[in-house]
Swiss-Prot record:
Keywords: Cell inner membrane, Cell membrane, Membrane, NAD, Quinone, Translocase, Transmembrane, Transmembrane helix, Transport, Ubiquinone
UniProt protein name: NADH-quinone oxidoreductase subunit K 2
Any GO molecular function: quinone binding
Top-rank taxon: Bacteria
CC per GO annotation: NADH dehydrogenase complex; plasma membrane
NCBIfam families given in the database record: PRK05715.1-2 (NF004320), PRK05715.1-3 (NF004321), PRK05715.1-5 (NF004323)
Catalysed reactions listed for this entry: a quinone + NADH + 5 H(+)(in) = a quinol + NAD(+) + 4 H(+)(out)
Subunit structure, as described in the record: NDH-1 is composed of 14 different subunits. Subunits NuoA, H, J, K, L, M, N constitute the membrane sector of the complex.
Residue stretches spanning the membrane: 2-22, 29-49, 61-81
Gene name of the encoded protein: nuoK2
InterPro entries on file: NADH_UbQ_OxRdtase_chain4L/K, NUOK/Mnh_C1-like
Organism: Geobacter sp. (strain M21)
Amino acid sequence: MLAIENYLILSAILFAIGTIGVLTRRNAIVIFMCIELMLNAVNLTFIAFSRHLGNIDGQVFVFFVMTVAAAEAAVGLALMIAFFKNRESIDVEDVNLMKL
């Protein structure tokens, strides 16, 4: 069995990749995928600590995070589809051009 440090290092690397992707990309779908990667990195940390400490609290919290992430995915994709129909682009710089 791997030590908890290995899981935490992997989680930190995944979170860093997601953060870099959010900060450097302009495509809304890629940014959305990077945010999901960051959420999964946090979930990995919760699971690692849950297994290390021997309780189930982290696993239950991961279940709730995954539920919220699924709802976020549905709403986010619906907004992207509506934005694409309006502007025919999913570039985040075009969002500033929208008026209410």
